[in-house]
């Protein structure tokens, strides 16, 4: 028996494997010159190498191109795969979003049988709903917990074919659909034209089973004579209520080439077609929150109040600025939240002192309360607040450090975080010891080694108590922010963090990982809406080649080991920096004299071919006698003698000691006791000298003098104006090519190398801040990778537009009327009368003179425009929401600005003037926001109890004072909203429904 069994086993293993055909089919409209490839893990599909994949062939079916390819495989074939759009040279242009597809063949097929795989292109919106923000926070995995499912759940969908007999006269169809927005008592069904699908009878619909995650599948054997089959997916709840998916019927047809041999058809139908989900959120820096318990600035635990506000108003997200420690200079300069001392450590400014211990001595409690009262000021006093918190924390530390360090929670935290925590604590100790964060001045400790670190942080060392204080602070900060995370998740509110593009050059990260940073350069942005001189943030640029050696481990750790602990969504600050970064030499102060890295420069050869040869004239500041006279008037000879050398008659060059921006600043900075007039004159001279220093057309590459970069805005220089016409035309052409054409593929490739490593390192929803000078390659890449873009109405991305129209925004965006880098909605309204009138007329469609201030009526309309936009998220600064009520809009509007990007030393100290507890108790204010959110479809009555509140746009008593001015003669457009409640206000007595147009001063009876 044993021998026979062995022989039988060998015979079975040696039998010839059956050959099967797989026909991949995908509808996708490409552009001219583009093709589709299928690539995958198997060698037949190129082993993920695009050029070695299988090319699909197109054919026209109505208005759609349908792509097909057939491959012959063995019966044991299995693979992961995806589709890629390629150009005519088979270079990848666009990849599908989301996870890799998986294919395993069913058992029991006859030799030569065909398996048809009907796929749909995986777009970003479909895949985003598998992110933690939706899956765990917003929907709470409810889509995977349906209780109204008929049949058994199939945990391995590839094995379910074995239970279905294969009939030569029929085709076994596997229907596959994803649905992430599903209520617990709903299930997914398929219904269609064939008898097997119930012939459109809801009662005979076929139930799908939840397999894994949000995937739902079923098997149906359909007679070949029934094809083509029309069908739809539907949802049924326990009460029998049916919800049909949107759009036209789906159609399933057998391929002509395999009509007779097809045995199995896999209909991978993407996602359930429903109205796109949209949400609303509120944005606030932690430091700006005011509460009855916070000391001097907002604290992590204050975020619970923001979560409560979100819940009460129907908002589903709270967005923050970076929360990392920025204590580089130990003064108010550190209020800048984007200049990280450590990309892992949290900022002690956000510590809740009262939560350090439940056994605080009375004297410490009294001191905390005294500090709270003293620091309860209009704005944040950064230095005093941080000093108070560190002082109290140190006293509690001295009392309870042994208790904390011996706790299981601390030991677990330390073990999980010591890789960054120990270097951070050592850095803080050395910063305090040497009085500077500039580690180049630390002597022996200036160069980081593990041996030096181990000595510094040794529990046996003389400095351990000072080092361990940082452990203590970070543990409590972590505990408090983690408490907020858990609270927000329980309330189904997304916490959204912010990932800064740079780090301070005097930081833990540049000390510990110096090879990752280019310390002789500085990061910024070219001139744009924010600053006509460009921005220079002072951060070192990245050595991406070095980072790539460990697959961008430093970036991945930032996300997986820090941000993902607390947030389920994040914003990439200046996502354009992952395509290319604007880089200045370290002696620059402004951002004007920068270049893109990476970029393809202009070569000496290509310029000489076009008749450009005087590179010295073009690449050095163009300073001539008449230019000096125009700048300095009668003082020009004095200035020329002090700052310049005359290298030819009436031609000047900067002296060595004044030939950079930093040198000019040093030369024009007066002593503190100088008169205000002298200081003003020196600053005016500095500006004029900067202008002369910027009289450059081409900038030489510092590593290769034969390469040049066009100076941004070179055509606005006197140097350019005094060139001959031929040179102007050539240089202008090269300028346009450099900035707008020749870099596109390079920048696309660069982003596709770096961004996926970040995105794949966590399950957070990712949004990219893509404002400013945006290359053409950016939007396709963001869409391909599943990143949401940002749309600020006053900063439209389309050329020639003054204002963006929220109704035209793409779904994969976050929209807002303002952001932390701009003035608020109210302040912007007051800045420019002409612009205000154009906006009022062109964007609000109103002909009356606009109010001088952005009153609640105007604010209401602007917010409503954004809420009704197609954008996935509408996220509003809290200041813009407070503009909805006169009582909260009395503060001067310019005091609500968080940042002034034109000022590199801006003091980030804005603080909301109303405690959050007061806002939460204001039912009228909360109701206005809630009504706006609900009426826009970004929340429903199921999201909260609306039994005592209307769910229509807020037309409240204080908004009716001007109604009688425009009560007649207004056109009712497609945006009209029926309001089913009665109002009686000044000039209006309505006893039947009214129709409100988008501006609520315009109300007419219906």
Which positions does each model-derived feature cover?
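Peripheral membrane interaction modules
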Residues: 2-15, 120-166, 193
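Small-residue-biased low-complexity repeat regions
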Residues: 5, 969-971, 985
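Serine/threonine-rich intrinsically disordered cytosolic regulatory regions enriched
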Residues: 13, 154, 158, 965-968, ...
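A short, amphipathic beta-strand motif
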Residues: 20-27, 171-179
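Aromatic-rich carbohydrate-binding modules that target alpha-glucans
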Residues: 29-78, 86-108, 181-227, 236-257, ...
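C2-type phospholipid-binding modules
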Residues: 103-122
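Catalytic cores of glycan-processing enzymes that make or break glycosidic bonds
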Residues: 146, 150, 162-165, 221, ...
């Amino acid at each position: 028996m044993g021998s026979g069994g062995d022989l039988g086993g060998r015979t079975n293993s040696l039998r010839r494997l059956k050959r099967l055909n797989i026909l991949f089919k995908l509808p996708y409209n490409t552009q001219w010159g583009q093709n589709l490839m299928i690539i995958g893990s198997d060698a037949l599909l190129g082993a993920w190498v695009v050029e070695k994949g299988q090319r699909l062939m197109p054919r026209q079916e109505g208005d759609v191109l349908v792509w097909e390819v057939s491959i012959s495989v063995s019966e044991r074939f299995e693979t992961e795969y995806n589709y890629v759009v390629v150009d005519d040279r088979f270079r990848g242009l666009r990849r599908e979003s989301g996870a890799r597809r998986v294919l395993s063949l069913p058992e029991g097929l006859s030799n030569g049988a065909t398996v048809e795989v009907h796929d749909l292109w995986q777009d970003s919106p479909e895949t985003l709903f598998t992110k933690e923000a939706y899956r765990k926070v917003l929907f709470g995995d409810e889509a995977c917990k349906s209780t109204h499912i008929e049949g058994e759940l199939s945990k391995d969908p590839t094995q379910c074919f074995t239970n279905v007999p294969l009939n030569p006269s029929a085709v076994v169809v596997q229907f596959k659909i994803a649905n992430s927005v599903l209520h617990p008592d709903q299930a997914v069904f398929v219904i269609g034209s064939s008898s097997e699908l119930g012939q459109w009878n809801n009662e005979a619909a076929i139930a799908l089973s939840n397999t894994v995650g949000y995937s739902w599948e079923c098997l149906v054997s359909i007679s070949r004579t029934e094809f083509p089959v029309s069908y739809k997916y539907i949802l049924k709840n326990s009460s029998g209520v049916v919800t049909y998916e949107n759009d036209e019927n789906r159609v399933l047809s057998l391929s002509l080439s395999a009509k007779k041999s097809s045995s199995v058809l896999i209909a991978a139908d993407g996602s359930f077609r429903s109205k796109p989900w949209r949400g609303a959120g509120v944005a606030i820096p932690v430091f700006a929150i005011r509460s009855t318990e916070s000391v001097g600035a907002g604290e992590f635990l204050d975020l619970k109040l923001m979560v409560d506000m979100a819940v009460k108003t129907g908002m589903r997200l709270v967005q923050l600025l970076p929360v990392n420690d920025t204590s580089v200079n130990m003064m108010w300069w550190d209020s800048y939240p984007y200049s990280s001392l450590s990309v892992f450590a949290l900022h002690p400014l956000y510590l809740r002192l009262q939560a350090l211990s439940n056994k605080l001595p009375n004297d410490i409690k009294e001191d905390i309360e005294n500090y709270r009262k003293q620091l309860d000021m209009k704005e944040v006093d950064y230095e005093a607040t941080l000093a108070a918190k560190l002082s109290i924390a140190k006293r509690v530390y001295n009392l309870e450090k042994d208790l904390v360090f011996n706790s299981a929670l601390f030991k677990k935290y330390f073990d999980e975080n010591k890789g960054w925590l120990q270097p951070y604590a050592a850095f803080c100790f050395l910063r305090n010891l040497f009085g500077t964060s500039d580690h180049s001045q630390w002597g022996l400790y200036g160069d980081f080694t593990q041996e030096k670190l181990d000595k510094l942080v040794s529990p046996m060392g003389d400095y351990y108590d000072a080092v361990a204080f940082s452990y203590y602070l970070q543990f409590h900060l972590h505990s408090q922010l983690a408490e907020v995370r858990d609270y927000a998740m329980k309330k189904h509110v997304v916490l959204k963090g912010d990932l800064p593009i740079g780090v301070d050059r005097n930081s833990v990260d540049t000390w510990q990982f110096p090879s990752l940073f280019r310390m002789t350069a500085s990061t910024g942005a070219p001139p744009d809406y924010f600053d006509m001189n460009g921005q220079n943030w002072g951060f070192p640029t990245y050595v991406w080649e070095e980072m790539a050696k460990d697959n961008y481990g430093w970036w991945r750790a930032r996300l997986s080991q820090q941000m993902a602990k607390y947030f389920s969504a994040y914003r990439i600050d200046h996502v354009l920096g992952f395509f290319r970064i604007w880089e200045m030499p370290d002696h620059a102060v402004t951002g004007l004299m920068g270049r893109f890295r990476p970029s393809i420069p202009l070569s000496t050869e290509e310029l000489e071919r076009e008749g450009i040869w005087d590179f010295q004239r073009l690449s050095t500041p163009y300073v001539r006698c008449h230019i000096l006279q125009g700048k300095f008037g009668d003082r020009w000879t004095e200035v020329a003698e002090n700052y310049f050398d005359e290298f030819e008659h009436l031609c000047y060059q900067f002296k060595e000691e004044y030939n950079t921006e930093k040198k000019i600043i040093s030369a024009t900075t007066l002593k503190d006791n100088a008169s205000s007039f002298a200081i003003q004159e020196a600053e005016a001279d500095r500006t004029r000298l900067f202008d002369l220093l910027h009289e450059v057309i081409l900038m030489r590459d510092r590593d290769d003098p034969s390469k040049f970069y066009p100076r941004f805005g070179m055509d606005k220089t006197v140097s350019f104006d005094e060139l001959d016409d031929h040179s102007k035309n050539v240089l202008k052409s090269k300028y346009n090519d450099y900035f707008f054409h020749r870099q596109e593929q390079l920048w696309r490739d660069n982003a596709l190398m770096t961004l996926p490593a970040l995105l794949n390192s966590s399950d957070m929803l990712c949004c990219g801040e893509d404002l400013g000078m945006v290359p053409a390659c950016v939007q396709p890449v963001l869409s391909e990778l599943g990143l949401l873009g940002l749309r600020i109405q006053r900063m439209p991305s389309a050329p020639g537009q003054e204002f963006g129209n929220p109704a035209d925004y793409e779904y994969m965006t976050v929209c807002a009327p303002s952001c932390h880098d701009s003035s608020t909605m109210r302040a912007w309204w007051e800045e420019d009368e002409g612009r205000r009138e154009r906006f009022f007329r062109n964007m609000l469609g109103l002909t009356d003179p606009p109010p001088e201030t952005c009153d609640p009526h105007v604010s209401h309309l602007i917010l409503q425009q954004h809420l009704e936009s197609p954008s996935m998220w509408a996220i509003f600064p809290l200041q813009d929401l407070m503009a909805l009520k006169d009582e909260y809009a009395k503060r001067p509007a310019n005091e609500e600005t968080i940042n002034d990007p034109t000022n590199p030393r801006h003091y980030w100290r804005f603080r909301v003037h109303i405690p959050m507890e007061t806002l939460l108790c204001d039912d009228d204010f909360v109701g206005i926001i809630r009504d706006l959110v609900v009426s826009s479809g970004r929340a429903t009555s199921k999201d909260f109890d609306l039994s005592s509140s209307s769910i229509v746009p807020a037309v409240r008593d204080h908004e009716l004072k001007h109604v009688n001015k425009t009560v007649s003669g207004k056109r009712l457009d497609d945006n009209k909203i029926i309001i089913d409640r009665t109002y009686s206000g000044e000039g209006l007595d309505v006893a039947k429904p009214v129709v409100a147009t988008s501006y609520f001063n315009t109300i007419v009876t219906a």
